[in-house]
């Protein structure tokens, strides 16, 4: 099995889910905690205390109130491990689109996320054992078609919920646990993501809004397209990240 490295400056679709497909986000506090972790752990400096907030109230975020518009200041670009381009959280899994800024930045960032959030979740729920289903997976974006579709794919993931009879765009506009609202220009979690790259790619917030509405109308067709692209990419760029190594796997 050959060893590989995640390309510095590369863009990666990162995802993981709960062990045995169990819920990893049980309530709003869990979603908020993970989203704050996306901000807090995106730093080359070590995090002093991964269990912050347990002493007073283990079910609430003590450092920032994400229930309103967050007042967190954007971090200095030189300190970032990755650019968080897009994200969506579902009850039992998550999708991230990351651009690596530092050597091993994706691995270090996901180590912090995985360890920190699992520690919080286990402490809060008085449980032990693994939370995630193995190591996180990362697929490198190697062509413009992949890059064009992945943000839509990630942001429309909540439509996999039972949305029969619901206006799909309105549903996405009201789904808070993603970066979709911020790309539309509505302040949701603006300090968490670095959106300039994709907004330039999509030619601004208004055009993003129009283009995702068009993408949703042909979602079934577009999903087949993105899965075909992903399968092609998997054969070459399917990485399993471990805490000490990065293994390049081939998929038949």
Per-segment meaning from a language model:
Residues 1-190, 199-252:
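Short catalytic/metal-binding and nucleic-acid-binding patches
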């Amino acid at each position: 099995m050959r060893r590989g490295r995640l390309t510095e400056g590369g863009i990666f679709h990162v995802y993981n889910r709960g062990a045995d497909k169990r819920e990893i986000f049980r309530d709003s506090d869990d979603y908020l905690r993970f989203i704050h972790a996306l901000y807090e752990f995106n730093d080359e400096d070590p995090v002093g205390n991964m269990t912050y907030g347990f002493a007073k109230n283990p079910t609430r975020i003590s450092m920032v109130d994400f229930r309103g518009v967050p007042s967190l200041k954007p971090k200095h670009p030189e300190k970032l491990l990755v650019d968080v381009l897009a994200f969506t959280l579902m009850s039992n899994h998550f999708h991230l689109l990351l651009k690596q800024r530092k050597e091993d930045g994706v691995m270090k960032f996901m180590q912090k996320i995985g360890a920190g959030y699992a520690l919080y979740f286990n402490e809060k729920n008085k449980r032990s054992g693994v939370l995630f289903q193995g190591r996180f997976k990362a697929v490198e974006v190697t062509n413009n078609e992949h890059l064009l579709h992945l943000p839509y794919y990630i942001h429309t993931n909540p439509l996999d919920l039972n949305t029969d009879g619901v206006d799909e765009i309105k549903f996405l506009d009201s789904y808070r646990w993603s970066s979709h609202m911020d790309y539309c220009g509505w302040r949701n979690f603006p300090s968490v993501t670095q959106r300039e790259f994709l907004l330039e790619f999509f030619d601004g917030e208004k055009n993003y809004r129009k283009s995702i509405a068009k993408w949703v109308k042909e979602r079934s067709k577009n999903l087949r397209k993105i899965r075909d692209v992903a399968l092609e990419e998997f054969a070459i760029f399917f990485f399993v990240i471990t805490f000490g190594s990065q293994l390049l796997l081939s998929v038949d």
